[in-house]
Structures are given as C-alpha cells and as structure tokens.
Swiss-Prot record:
This is Probable Sec-independent protein translocase protein TatE. One of its GO terms (biological process) is protein transport by the Tat complex. The gene is tatE. NCBIfam families: PRK01614.1, PRK03625.1, tatAE. The chain crosses the membrane at residues 4-21. It comes from Citrobacter koseri (strain ATCC BAA-895 / CDC 4225-83 / SGSC4696). It is found in: Cell inner membrane. It holds the Pfam family TatA_B_E. PANTHER family: SEC-INDEPENDENT PROTEIN TRANSLOCASE PROTEIN TATA, SEC-INDEPENDENT PROTEIN TRANSLOCASE PROTEIN TATE. It is a single-pass membrane protein. GO terms for cellular component: TAT protein transport complex.
Length: 67
C-alpha cells in the first residue's frame, strides 16, 4: 500500500497539470532554473574569494617567516 507505482505518479502529474496548467508550470520551471544558476554563481564567487584570501594569508606567512 505504501509503494509508489508508475500509475500513481501519472495520476499525480495529471492533477498538477490540471491545477496549475502548462503555462504556469513552464514559467515555474524557468524561474527555478534561474534561481539555481544564481545560487551556483554565488557559491563559485564565494569560493573564489575565499581562495584568494587564503592565498594571501599563505604569502603573508611565507614573508613573515623569512629571516
């Protein structure tokens, strides 16, 4: 009874299409894709900034340890 079959998934998909319509689902998918791209870009920018800061710290340590 708790198993999810292909027919149950098709019924749920049909209900979603009937409730929201195909146009709304297309715009929702596009908005979701844009949000994911923005999130990934922000994460990459943050990682690049952290690497630059870490690289600067390493250079500062090398210079300070030179005698």
């Amino acid at each position: 009874m708790g198993e999810i079959s292909i027919t149950k998934l098709l019924v749920v998909a049909a209900l979603v299409v009937l409730l929201f319509g195909t146009r709304k689902l297309r715009t929702l998918g596009g908005d979701l894709g844009t949000a994911i791209k923005g999130f990934k870009k922000a994460m990459n920018d943050e990682d690049a900034g952290a690497k630059k800061e870490a690289g600067g710290d390493i250079q500062a340590e090398k210079l300070s340890h030179k005698e």
